C-alpha cells in the first residue's frame, strides 16, 4: 500500500484555490442513502425493487483542474442483496435517483456486470465484477481528460476519454444491505498513485525543457540578472557580473552604494538613521511620499520598542545628566540621529524628573489607541488650530521630522504595562527609562502625524491599522511573546526596506521592481490562469522547481 502525500489525492494542490473533494455531501444525495463515519461511509436504505430505486451521492466539491491528477478509492464493505453498485463521476445537476453513468455527463463502473457506462443506459464491457472486500479506485487525469479504474491495486486501463470539467466523485447503490467506504486520501491507497503521478510529472517537465526559445535569450537573461543585482544593491557583484558579460551598469555605482547603505540600516532596525540618511541623500523623496514616511516612522516606533533603533540605544547608553544636556542643547548624540532637538526639549521639559511614573509610561497604549479610534471613526473633522503650523518649521509639508509644536495631551488611565527589569526576559526599549520616555514622545508625534495625514489626504485604513498594531505592542508586559509580537520579528523590516528601495529607484527613472522578479511573477500568474481555465498540466509546472 502506498502512502499518499498530505493532500493525499491530487498532484497540484499548490495552485488550487478551490478545495478538493474530501467527503460525500449530505446535501447532494438521494434520500435512499444514509451517510456515517464522517460522511465517508454510504449505506442503502431504500426498497431496492427496481432500477427506479437506485440512489447516488456526490462529493462535497468538484475536482479542481489544478489537481492535475485526482484519485480516490471506494471499499465495498457489503455488496448487499444484489451488488448493484456504481462508482464514478458526474457533473452538478445530474439526476441522483440513478446510478452513475446512466445519464449525460455521468460516468460509472458497475459491480454487478463489470461494465462501464458513459452517459448512457447501455454499458460496455470494461473490467471484472467487484464484491464485498474489493477496493475500487477511480483516477481522473485532468491533463488528457481521461479516467481509469483500479481493482485491489491493479489498473484496469482507460475507461473514459474527453471528460468535461467540474466533475464530482459519485457513488450509487440500488439494493438493501449495500455499504461502501470512501477514501479521499485520509488513509494510504491500495494503488500506487504516486508512481503514476511521477510518470506524468516527468512527461510535462520534459515538454517544458524541450520548448524552443528563439532570439538572443541568453543576453536577455544576462540583462535581467544584472538589473536584479543593481536593484537589490549588490554593488560589487553587479560590477563583476557586468564586466564578465560585457554589459554596462544602468545606475551609477555611487547611487547603488547609497541605496545599499540605506537598506542595511533598515534591515538592522536602525530606522532613525535610515530616515535621516534618506533625507540627506534624496531631500525631496519623503516630502513627496508622506505615506511612505509614515510607514518608516511607524517602523521606527516598533524598533524603539525592540530597543534596536539608534535613538533609544543612544539614550540607553547615557546618564540622565548627559541626557538633559543633549535635549537642551544643539549637540547631537554621537550617531547623529537625534535631529529634532526642539521637540526633544519640549518632551523632556515635561518630565524633568528622570523617574517618570511607570504607570504613566504604561498607560500610553490605551490612551493612544483611544485617541486614534476617536478621530479615525469620526467623520466630523477635528479642530486643528493647534496643528496649523505643521510638524516642523523646517520642512515645507510638515512631515519630515514628524513632530508637532503643540502635542495632544494624553489622558491618564489605570491600565499598567510592566517594564520588566528582570534578566530572564527582554526589556522594553532595552530597559532604559530615558528610552521609554523618548518612545512615548515619539508615539505622540506619530499620532499627531497620523491626524494631519488624515486631514490633508483623507482616511487611510492601512495607516490607521498600522499605527494601532504598533501601539498594541505596549499592551503587553512581554511584547515579543504577544499576539502582536510578530511586528518585532526582523523579517518584518523587509517589506519596509523594499518599499523605500522602490521609491528611490523611481526617482532615478529605474524600475520599481526588477524585471527578473516580474518575469517570475508573470510565470506564476500564468500557471494560476491555466488552473482557472482547466488546463491540468499546470499542476506539474511549479516555478520553484526551476529556481536553483
From Swiss-Prot:
Residues 2-189 form the B30.2/SPRY domain. May act as scaffolding protein, and as adapter protein to couple membrane receptors to intracellular signaling pathways. Acts as a mediator of cell spreading and actin cytoskeleton rearrangement. Core component of the CTLH E3 ubiquitin-protein ligase complex that mediates ubiquitination and subsequent proteasomal degradation of target proteins. GO terms for cellular component: cytoplasm; nucleus; plasma membrane. The keyword Translocase does not apply. Residues 217-249 form the LisH domain. This is Ran-binding protein 9. Belongs to the RANBP9/10 family. Residues 255-312 form the CTLH domain. Residues 1-26 are annotated as: Disordered. Disulfide bonds: none annotated. PROSITE patterns: B302_SPRY, CTLH, LISH. InterPro entries: B30.2/SPRY, B30.2/SPRY_sf, ConA-like_dom_sf, CRA_dom, CTLH/CRA, CTLH_C, LisH, SPRY_dom. Residues 1-14 have a biased composition (Low complexity). The keyword Cell membrane applies. It is found in: Cytoplasm; Cell membrane; Nucleus. Identified in the CTLH complex that contains at least MAEA, RMND5A (or alternatively its paralog RMND5B), GID8, WDR26, and RANBP9 and/or RANBP10. Residues 15-26 have a biased composition (Basic and acidic residues). It comes from Xenopus tropicalis (Western clawed frog). It is a peripheral membrane protein. It comes from the Eukaryota. Keywords: Cell membrane, Cytoplasm, Membrane, Nucleus. Its main location: cytoplasm.
Amino acid at each position: 500500500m502506498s502512502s499518499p502525500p498530505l493532500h493525499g489525492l491530487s498532484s497540484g494542490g499548490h495552485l488550487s484555490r478551490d478545495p478538493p473533494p474530501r467527503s460525500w455531501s449530505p446535501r447532494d444525495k438521494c434520500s435512499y442513502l444514509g451517510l456515517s463515519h464522517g460522511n465517508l461511509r454510504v449505506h442503502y436504505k431504500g426498497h431496492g425493487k427496481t432500477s427506479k430505486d437506485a440512489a447516488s451521492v456526490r462529493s462535497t466539491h468538484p475536482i479542481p483542474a489544478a489537481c492535475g491528477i485526482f484519485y480516490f478509492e471506494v471499499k465495498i464493505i457489503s455488496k448487499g442483496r444484489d451488488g448493484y453498485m456504481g462508482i464514478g463521476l458526474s457533473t452538478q445537476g445530474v439526476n441522483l435517483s440513478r446510478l452513475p453513468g446512466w445519464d449525460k455527463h455521468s460516468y460509472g463502473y458497475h459491480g454487478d456486470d463489470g461494465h462501464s457506462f458513459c452517459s448512457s443506459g447501455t454499458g460496455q464491457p470494461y473490467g471484472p465484477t467487484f464484491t464485498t472486500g474489493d477496493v475500487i479506485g477511480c483516477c481522473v487525469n485532468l491533463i488528457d481528460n481521461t479516467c481509469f479504474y483500479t481493482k485491489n491495486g491493479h489498473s484496469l486501463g482507460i475507461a473514459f476519454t474527453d471528460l468535461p470539467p467540474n466533475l464530482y466523485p459519485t457513488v450509487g447503490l440500488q439494493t438493501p444491505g449495500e455499504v461502501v467506504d470512501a477514501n479521499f486520501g485520509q488513509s494510504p491507497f491500495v494503488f500506487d498513485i504516486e508512481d503514476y503521478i511521477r510518470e506524468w510529472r516527468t512527461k510535462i517537465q520534459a515538454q517544458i525543457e524541450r520548448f524552443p526559445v528563439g532570439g538572443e535569450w541568453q543576453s536577455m537573461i544576462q540583462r535581467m540578472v544584472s538589473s536584479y543585482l543593481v536593484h537589490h544593491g549588490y554593488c560589487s557583484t553587479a560590477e563583476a557580473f557586468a564586466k564578465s558579460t560585457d554589459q554596462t551598469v544602468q545606475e551609477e555605482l555611487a547611487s547603488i552604494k547609497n541605496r545599499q547603505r540605506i537598506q542595511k540600516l533598515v534591515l538592522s532596525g536602525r530606522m532613525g538613521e535610515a530616515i535621516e540618511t534618506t533625507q540627506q541623500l534624496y531631500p525631496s523623496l519623503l516630502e513627496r511620499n508622506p505615506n511612505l514616511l509614515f510607514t518608516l516612522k511607524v517602523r521606527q516606533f516598533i524598533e524603539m520598542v525592540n530597543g534596536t533603533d539608534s535613538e533609544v540605544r543612544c539614550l540607553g547608553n547615557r546618564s540622565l545628566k548627559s541626557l538633559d544636556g543633549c535635549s537642551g542643547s544643539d549637540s547631537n548624540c554621537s550617531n547623529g540621529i537625534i535631529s529634532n532637538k526642539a521637540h526633544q526639549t519640549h518632551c523632556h521639559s515635561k518630565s524633568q524628573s528622570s523617574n517618570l511614573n511607570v504607570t504613566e509610561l504604561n498607560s500610553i497604549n490605551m490612551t493612544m489607541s483611544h485617541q486614534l479610534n476617536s478621530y479615525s471613526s469620526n467623520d466630523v473633522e477635528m479642530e486643528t488650530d493647534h496643528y496649523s503650523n505643521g510638524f516642523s518649521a523646517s520642512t515645507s509639508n510638515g512631515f519630515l521630522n514628524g513632530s508637532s509644536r503643540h502635542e495632544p495631551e494624553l489622558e491618564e488611565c489605570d491600565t499598567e504595562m510592566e517594564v520588566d527589569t528582570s534578566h530572564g526576559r527582554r526589556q522594553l526599549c532595552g530597559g532604559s527609562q530615558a528610552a521609554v520616555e523618548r518612545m512615548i514622545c515619539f508615539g505622540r508625534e506619530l499620532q499627531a502625524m497620523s491626524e494631519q495625514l488624515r486631514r490633508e489626504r483623507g482616511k487611510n485604513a492601512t495607516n490607521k491599522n498600522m499605527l494601532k498594531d504598533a501601539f498594541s505592542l505596549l499592551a503587553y508586559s512581554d511584547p515579543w511573546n504577544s499576539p502582536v509580537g510578530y511586528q518585532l520579528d526582523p523579517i518584518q523590516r523587509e517589506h519596509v526596506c523594499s518599499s523605500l528601495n522602490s521609491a528611490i529607484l523611481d526617482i532615478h527613472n529605474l524600475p520599481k521592481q526588477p524585471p527578473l522578479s516580474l518575469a517570475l511573477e508573470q510565470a506564476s500568474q500564468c500557471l494560476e490562469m491555466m488552473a482557472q481555465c482547466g488546463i491540468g498540466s499546470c499542476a506539474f509546472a511549479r516555478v520553484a522547481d526551476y529556481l536553483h
